[in-house]
């Protein structure tokens, strides 16, 4: 049976938890640095950090371009409250990115680990490009987790952890969790190349080495698992966690040094407009 402390940690995931999210801040910062290294802008006037969360990327953007007008945008009041404590010059806006529009054209739209939550990239990305100034840049990285082992194990638990091996949650939840918002690399190119002067697209797998008794769960519960943990009632959540934690421990055993290997794939996109 899953431990009581895990039930408490997973109890209500309808809100973002800044403290839990920052548990792996160094590892979450790594793809941001990789993405920034591919952004070729000398002195952007106006930067929007989309899905800024606690400001991990916002702070790096402020360091690189201290003179830029910097805006952090996120849907979570809890995350924005944490980000506002950073010692940087930035404004903070609470908004749903599905409907958000920049007040003024952006030199850089920076989206770290957020666009994979939004559907219909074939219309989303052109809409974001339309909010750039001439020569502006859209830079994004997205976890490509639909084929990851921990995600497939989550789907397995959702489909079979109910009484007698029945599914948990609503059919709508199970359908949504099976959807794939992130496109293939070649489809991103076909979408963006006709609209841009330059497009740089790549995929990276980082072998993340994580600490703790349940590090894979601690990582995914604050992001990918939020819809599941937010919908399931207490009994269904208990059944789900019993099954899912057991599967994770079997598939991701601790190494001899007590740490856990957590391979993680991400797609990177840098799309620049003509001047």
UniProtKB/Swiss-Prot annotation:
Its job: Catalyzes the S-adenosylmethionine monomethyl esterification of trans-aconitate.
Membership in a protein family: Belongs to the methyltransferase superfamily. Tam family.
Name this polypeptide is given: Trans-aconitate 2-methyltransferase
Database matches in Pfam families: Methyltransf_25
Biological processes, Gene Ontology terms: methylation
Domain of life: Bacteria
Reaction(s) the record says it catalyses: trans-aconitate + S-adenosyl-L-methionine = (E)-3-(methoxycarbonyl)pent-2-enedioate + S-adenosyl-L-homocysteine
Main location: cytoplasm
Protein species of origin: Pseudomonas paraeruginosa (strain DSM 24068 / PA7)
Keywords of this entry: Cytoplasm, Methyltransferase, S-adenosyl-L-methionine, Transferase
Transmembrane segments: none
Disulfide linkage: none
GO MF term set: trans-aconitate 2-methyltransferase activity
Transmembrane helix among keywords: no
Its EC number(s): 2.1.1.144
